[in-house]
């Protein structure tokens, strides 16, 4: 009997073993289609999630738990005593992905890093104009062209960056998605074949997943990269099910059609907490939701008009209606858990009467006509876009301002807003590394007006100098003073209507392990498993 039982147990074990060892696909319900996969051209979080977060790697990355920059493709780096030279030592034997459209002949080397940055920095580089009208928004807004004097190859596995001036934010900047490292060999192949646009549709990186197929507004399929240099993913395939409606994303995860649902509505989060088949991952987000007021459009060029608009908007009702009172009311450009946040600044007090009086003082006693731009579908930074826009529209009507709500598809909205076509724009920003400059340079510098992501389109020499001063030294006290003074200008000029510091959340099936929502809106599926 003992032998029979043992044999039966062994047989069962053999039958069960493949099931235990076998990895499974992971389907993620995402909110919209990426702009493409050539991440340096774009600044949307959706595009970063679909490209930089899964296909590529950067020289260094940001450890969210430890709150510090850590090695990635570079396993170490040195900084000269004057803060002007950074030398990165590349990890050996890192392979670029092998696909049916490219087979690399060598591993990652210094030429790849030099190509990646020269493409963005040098207008004589043949790849510089490939980005077209979109340019390189992050590189431009962060001022890298002015900051970086030269990028050069020391040897096959060593790269040197020479700066024109010390910059405390340089290494953190390299954690951002736009700093993903590209294959120079693949770029040369495409250039010779006159197929440069393939870089945006057929990406090659060093990351854990590689693109298999993409159907716009429907699905992105990734295979696991078998040559990945880091820990191998615990899933065998990754699928992005593009699902713009947050309510539909919630329905899909309840039905088991996806294992992770990103950017749920606050009410869906509350419902999921009561559902034993689901889990909720939450974190205070390093994000800010806001309405940008285009200072290059009349009468929004008048600071009194912008202040009146701030006074006219009932943000308490907005918080309740759009965010179900989750998150924290916003006052300054970045969240209060950020060092240098100025707690002495108070939000504009809601008062239609005071707003109307100030508008009259500005020369508009009968109001004016304007537009409010908003995306059609919800996200963590705007769960119910149209409802929020209609609340602002109704409040502005009380002071005589006639605002037309324009619901514009996300890709078109970003494109036209970067050209400054909007009046008032519901927008949001997710930081990448916890540094205040991650908001200040891309959203308020003069460089960012040129790149298009300073949506207030405000260029002021005083503010620009404070932003520059804030990153020219590593002294936290000096940086804090610069950023506090900058926040006062931003508030007094009423460049935004600050809305909410949201809570980042994601829903997962109960059988999913290893996934944590990022406060920065990034995604990491490398450690995720599906039981």
Regions found by a protein language model. Give the residues of each.
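A structural "hinge/loop" feature
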Residues: 33-49, 73-74, 100-104, 168-180, ...
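Detector for C-terminal structural segments
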Residues: 24-30, 50, 168, 215, ...
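Structural transition elements
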Residues: 209, 294, 329-362, 379-387
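Surface-exposed binding/hinge segments that line
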Residues: 89, 121-187
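Gly/Pro-rich hinge or "lid" segments in bacterial periplasmic/extracellular proteins
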Residues: 63-64, 146, 156-157, 166-233, ...
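N-terminal lobe/hinge region of extracytoplasmic solute-binding protein
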Residues: 29-81, 118, 125, 202-206
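Aromatic- and charge-enriched surface segment that lines or borders ligand/interaction sites
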Residues: 75-127, 160, 252, 299
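Extracellular/periplasmic solute-recognition and catalytic clefts
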Residues: 130, 212-226, 239-297, 316, ...
């Amino acid at each position: 009997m003992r032998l029979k039982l043992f044999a039966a147990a062994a047989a069962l074990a053999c039958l069960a073993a493949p099931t235990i060892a076998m990895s499974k696909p992971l389907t993620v319900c995402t909110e919209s289609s990426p702009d493409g996969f050539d991440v340096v051209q774009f600044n949307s979080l959706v595009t970063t999630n679909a490209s930089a977060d899964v296909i590529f790697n950067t020289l260094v990355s940001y450890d969210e738990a430890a709150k510090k920059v850590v090695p990635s493709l570079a396993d170490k780096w040195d900084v000269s005593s004057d803060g002007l030279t950074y030398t990165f030592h590349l990890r050996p034997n890192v392979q670029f992905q092998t696909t049916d459209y490219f087979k690399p002949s060598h591993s990652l080397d210094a030429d790849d890093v030099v190509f990646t940055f020269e493409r963005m920095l040098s207008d004589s580089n043949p790849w510089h104009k490939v980005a077209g009208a979109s340019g390189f928004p992050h590189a431009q807004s962060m001022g890298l062209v002015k900051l970086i004097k030269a990028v050069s190859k020391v040897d096959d596995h060593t790269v040197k960056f020479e700066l024109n001036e010390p910059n405390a934010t340089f290494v953190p900047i390299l954690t951002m998605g736009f700093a993903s490292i590209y294959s120079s060999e693949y770029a040369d192949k495409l250039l010779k074949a006159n197929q440069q646009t393939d870089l945006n549709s057929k990406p090659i990186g060093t990351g854990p997943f590689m693109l298999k197929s993409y159907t716009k507004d429907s699905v992105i399929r990734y295979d696991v990269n078998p040559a990945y240099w880091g820990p191998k993913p615990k899933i065998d395939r990754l699928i992005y099910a593009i699902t713009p409606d947050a309510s539909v994303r919630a329905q899909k995860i309840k039905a088991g059609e996806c294992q992770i649902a990103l950017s749920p509505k606050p009410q869906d989060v509350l419902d999921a907490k009561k559902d034993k088949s689901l889990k909720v991952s939450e974190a205070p987000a390093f994000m800010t939701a806001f309405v940008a007021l285009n200072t290059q459009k009349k009468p929004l060029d008048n600071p009194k008009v912008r202040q009146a608009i701030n006074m006219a908007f009932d943000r308490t009702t907005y918080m309740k209606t759009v965010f179900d009172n989750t998150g924290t009311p916003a006052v300054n450009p970045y969240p209060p858990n950020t060092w240098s946040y100025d707690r002495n600044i108070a939000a504009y007090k809601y008062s239609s009467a005071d707003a109307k009086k100030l508008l009259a003082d500005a020369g508009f006693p009968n109001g004016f006509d304007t537009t409010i731009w908003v995306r059609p579908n919800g996200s963590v930074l705007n769960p119910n876009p149209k409802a929020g826009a209609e609340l602002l529209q109704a409040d502005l009507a009380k002071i005589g301002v006639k605002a037309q709500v324009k619901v514009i598809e996300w890709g078109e909205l970003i494109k036209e807003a970067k050209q400054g076509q909007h009046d008032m724009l519901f927008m949001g920003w997710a930081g990448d590394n916890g540094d205040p400059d991650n908001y200040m340079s891309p959203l308020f510098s003069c460089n960012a007006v040129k790149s298009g992501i300073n949506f207030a389109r405000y260029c002021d020499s005083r503010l620009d100098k404070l932003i520059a001063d804030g990153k020219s030294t590593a002294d936290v006290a000096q940086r804090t003073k610069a950023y506090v003074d900058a926040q006062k200008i931003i508030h007094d000029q009423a460049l935004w209507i600050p809305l909410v510091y949201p809570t980042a959340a994601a829903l997962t099936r109960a059988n999913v392990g290893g996934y944590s929502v990022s406060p920065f809106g990034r995604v990491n599926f490398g450690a995720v498993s599906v039981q």
